[in-house]
Curated annotation (Swiss-Prot):
Record keyword Cell division present: no
Lineage: Eukaryota, Metazoa, Chordata, Craniata, Vertebrata
Described function: Subunit a, of the mitochondrial membrane ATP synthase complex (F(1)F(0) ATP synthase or Complex V) that produces ATP from ADP in the presence of a proton gradient across the membrane which is generated by electron transport complexes of the respiratory chain. ATP synthase complex consist of a soluble F(1) head domain - the catalytic core - and a membrane F(1) domain - the membrane proton channel. These two domains are linked by a central stalk rotating inside the F(1) region and a stationary peripheral stalk.
Protein name from the UniProt record: ATP synthase F(0) complex subunit a
Keywords: ATP synthesis, CF(0), Hydrogen ion transport, Ion transport, Membrane, Mitochondrion, Mitochondrion inner membrane, Transmembrane, Transmembrane helix, Transport
Family: Belongs to the ATPase A chain family.
CDD domains attached to this UniProt entry: ATP-synt_Fo_a_6
């Protein structure tokens, strides 16, 4: 039982350090007037992320651009590294995702309540709410606001864990059925390949969704 608990709270620091170091290795900064294809792809990717995440923000919100781009690259690379054989995805640990979600959510909400108190409080009561529903709506909206970091972390954890578990179960079935019939192993092997491709897409999409929701929370309170 103690080993199970320690495994649940175990944080694979090595994978996270690789995810932090990979952008510096794979995405070099341009130091010459004529750039190569790799640097062009790098610049296009960063511009695409900035366009998707920051198009709704004002000048104050744009100060978060470096944070949001770094967050997207970090989560995306961490998810991709977790798909390597004999590796482990830190984003399958709820504690890791909560350690990212709670500070980022706090950083978007606290400035809103500090500098735009009336506007932030107005979000707790939608316009046109009937009088008899006001107390209930305020409670519901407050709970909805407070559980946002939890839903952020749980969404990322659930999606990454589900994908890895599905690949593991299908791979185990492939090995088990390999001695039965050649056609069966072919079908299951193709299924594993397709699931792996799907999980590669999910790894990048979940990184984008996590950063996008933080961006929307920031826009709501900026």
């Amino acid at each position: 039982m103690n080993e199970e608990l320690s495994t649940f709270f175990y944080v694979p620091v090595g994978t996270m350090m690789l995810a932090i170091a990979f952008p510096a290795i794979l995405l070099p900064t341009p130091n010459r007037l004529i750039t190569n294809r790799w640097i062009t792809i790098q610049q296009w990717l960063i511009q695409l992320i900035m366009k998707q995440l920051l198009s709704i923000h004002n000048t104050k919100g744009l100060s978060w651009s470096l944070m949001l781009i770094t967050l997207t690259l970090f989560i995306g690379l961490t998810n991709l590294l977790g798909l390597l054989p004999y590796s482990f995805a830190p984003t399958t640990q709820l504690t890791v995702n909560l350690s990212m979600a709670i500070p980022l959510w706090t950083g978007t909400v606290v400035p809103g309540f500090r500098y735009k108190t009336k506007i932030s409080l107005a979000h707790l009561l939608p316009q046109g709410t009937p009088m008899f529903l006001i107390p209930m709506i305020i409670i519901i909206e407050t709970i909805s606001l407070l559980i946002r970091p939890v839903t952020l972390a749980v969404r990322l954890t659930a999606n990454i864990t589900a994908g890895h578990s599905l690949i593991h179960l299908t791979g185990t079935a492939t090995l088990t059925l390999s001695s039965i019939h050649s056609m069966t192993i072919t079908v299951t092997f193709v299924t594993v390949i397709l699931l792996t491709i799907l999980e590669l897409a999910v790894a990048l999409i979940q990184a984008y969704v996590f950063a996008l929701l933080i961006s929307l929370y920031l826009h709501e309170n900026a």
